[in-house]
């Protein structure tokens, strides 16, 4: 990882940043994912996913005991949500396709759900009718429960063929209008945090539960849900299973790209990437070579794990050296499919951490993912946080981190085209706040301003970043956190029919980045203002 960065060639505008500081073809948008917003878990022919099963069998492992059955009801309110995107003047909207909504049984042979096809056709057509470019994620972690039951999901290489078939169906049905595809969102997160690495679930890959049997009830198994897959080899560690899941995710990505390039590229002319989670790995002691090397290893285990195979067909050298035969090798044919299987790199950035060197564990049988890299992480140094915490846990606000991450990718991964596919911050869902108070999100406003300024600074220095998608468009159901964390530009009233209201950050984003503002630097507002985002707080209205 680079420690010496070039001097900026242009001044940056700081918190006065707006669309005019970026080139006309730079994309601004916001994102969501299917399970987190759609709801309608038992509507429209959708089958259950592993998240349906997990949240219903183990509600105690979701922070507020909730689930995504209703989420924020975007399945029924998608036209309203697209109207919001249009009012904000965004170029793009990122959403994911629910695999079990398209293929309730997980595979083509189990049947195609035409109601699901119709829903996404309607969504895409509505976006295009409103001059909004769709960015579509194929896999945002909602494995069909049917495939989990059949062969343990991504712990089995059987899923590669089923994912390829699912992807091909999506290209056939939607590719005439969708030109920007993301195969997999955060494979590191899925393999690790939502996988089998820790003693704290959800361990979604390993779930082997009774299916959701009928549309209105949820089957609760009489015995505990298995937390480790029954097909695991005797004697393997949970970390070994994490790498197995990651390996199959990479093969699934490559298979999807292959089928697109073989059958659709010439006529549809779409582009592809994976959305990879990043974190600025800052050496705890920058004068200590061991800590500098540890920070580099940490970035390998976070980002390089999934990026390096797309360049060389091999995992990062540090991972191969430390893991040895525990890390599977790619065959020559698999390497051919992996190398170059991207047009751009999607970067998800939220936070940063200090990294220091650590000794490897003496007992290899007790190896877990975070001991494999021989590094420690901490959010503080000498009692001082690396950045202020957004809430009670995990997200330290470190805007300079996105600048360093972008440079590291440029310098160490062949200078790719980059889109920021997620960047955002949460606030705690404080139910004591009034609606007016809940819309005041100064922390998010400053977070976005400061991070965008650092993105612009990186562009000035030659990083080929071409778009920025906020996470997220709206408050939604946040996986393990349930409804306790709010990431949205748009406030969603969970208690009154999921009514949508703009927060201060949404109003600022519209006024600074509306697509009408492409021409003049420092122009403050769109030329035509319908006032929808400036409703006085005493007269808040639903969209």
UniProtKB/Swiss-Prot annotation:
Organism: Carapichea ipecacuanha
Site (Controls the gate shape and acceptance of substrates): 394
Keywords: Alkaloid metabolism, Cytoplasm, Glycosidase, Hydrolase
Any single Gene Ontology cellular-component annotation: cytosol
PROSITE patterns, per the entry: GLYCOSYL_HYDROL_F1_2 (PS00653)
Class of enzymatic activity (EC top level): hydrolase
Chain positions recorded as a beta-D-glucoside binding sites: 36, 140, 185-186, 350, 422, 471, 487
Similarity-based family: Belongs to the glycosyl hydrolase 1 family.
Subcellular locations according to the entry: Cytoplasm, Cytosol
SUPFAM superfamilies: (Trans)glycosidases
Function: Beta-glucosidase catalyzing deglucosylation on N-deacetylisoipecoside and N-deacetylipecoside.
Molecular functions (GO terms): beta-glucosidase activity
Pfam families (UniProt xref): Glyco_hydro_1
Name of the protein in its database record: Ipecac alkaloid beta-glucosidase 2
Residues forming the catalytic site: 186 (proton donor), 422 (nucleophile)
Origin superkingdom: Eukaryota
Pathway: Alkaloid biosynthesis
């Amino acid at each position: 990882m680079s420690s010496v960065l070039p001097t900026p060639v242009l001044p940056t505008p700081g918190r006065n940043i707006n669309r005019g500081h970026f080139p006309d073809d730079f994309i601004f948008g916001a994102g969501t994912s299917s399970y987190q917003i759609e709801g309608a878990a038992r509507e429209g022919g959708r089958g259950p996913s592993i998240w349906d099963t997990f949240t219903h069998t183990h509600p105690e492992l979701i922070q507020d005991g909730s689930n995504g059955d209703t989420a924020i009801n975007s399945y029924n309110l998608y036209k309203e949500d697209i109207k919001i995107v249009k009012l904000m003047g965004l170029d793009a909207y990122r959403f994911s396709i629910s695999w079990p909504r398209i293929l309730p049984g997980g595979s083509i042979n189990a049947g195609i759900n035409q109601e699901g096809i119709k829903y996404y056709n309607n969504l895409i057509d509505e976006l295009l009718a409103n001059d909004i470019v769709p960015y579509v994620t194929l896999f945002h972690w909602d494995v069909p429960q049917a495939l989990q039951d059949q062969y343990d999901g991504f712990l089995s290489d059987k899923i590669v063929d089923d994912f390829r078939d699912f992807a091909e169906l999506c290209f056939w049905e939607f590719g005439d209008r969708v030109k920007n595809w993301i195969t997999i969102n955060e494979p590191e997160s899925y393999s690790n945090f939502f996988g089998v690495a820790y003693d704290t679930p959800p361990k979604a890959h390993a779930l082997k539960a009774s299916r959701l049997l009928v549309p209105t009830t949820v089957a609760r198994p009489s015995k505990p849900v298995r937390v480790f897959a029954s097909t695991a080899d005797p004697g393997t560690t949970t970390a070994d299973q994490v790498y197995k899941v990651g390996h199959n995710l990479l093969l699934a990505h490559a298979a999807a790209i292959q089928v697109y390039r073989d059958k659709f590229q010439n006529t549809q002319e779409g582009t592809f990437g994976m959305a990879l989670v990043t974190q600025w790995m800052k050496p705890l002691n920058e004068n200590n070579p061991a800590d500098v090397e540890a920070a580099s290893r940490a970035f390998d285990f976070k980002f390089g794990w999934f990026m390096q195979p797309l360049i060389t067909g091999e995992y990062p050298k540090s991972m191969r050296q430390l893991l040895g035969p525990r890390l599977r090798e790619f065959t020559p044919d698999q390497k051919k499919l992996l190398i170059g299987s991207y047009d751009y790199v999607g970067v998800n950035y939220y936070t940063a951490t200090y990294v220091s060197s650590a000794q490897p564990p003496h007992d290899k049988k007790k190896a877990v993912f975070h001991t494999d890299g021989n590094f420690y992480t901490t959010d503080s140094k000498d009692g001082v946080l690396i950045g202020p915490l957004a809430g009670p846990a995990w997200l330290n606000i470190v805007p300079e981190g996105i600048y360093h991450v972008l440079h590291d990718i440029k310098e160490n991964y062949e200078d790719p085209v980059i889109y920021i596919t997620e960047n955002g911050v949460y606030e705690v869902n404080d139910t004591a706040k009034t609606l007016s108070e809940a819309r005041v999100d100064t922390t998010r406003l400053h977070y976005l301003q400061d991070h965008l300024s650092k993105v612009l600074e990186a562009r000035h220095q030659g990083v080929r970043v071409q778009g920025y998608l906020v996470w997220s468009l709206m408050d939604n159901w946040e996986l393990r956190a349930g409804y306790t964390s709010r990431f949205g530009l748009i406030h969603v009233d969970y208690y009154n029919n999921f009514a949508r209201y703009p927060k201060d950050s949404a109003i600022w984003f519209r006024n600074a980045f509306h697509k009408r503002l492409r021409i003049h630097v420092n122009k403050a507002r769109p030329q035509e203002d319908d006032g929808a985002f400036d409703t006085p707080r005493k007269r808040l209205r639903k969209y």
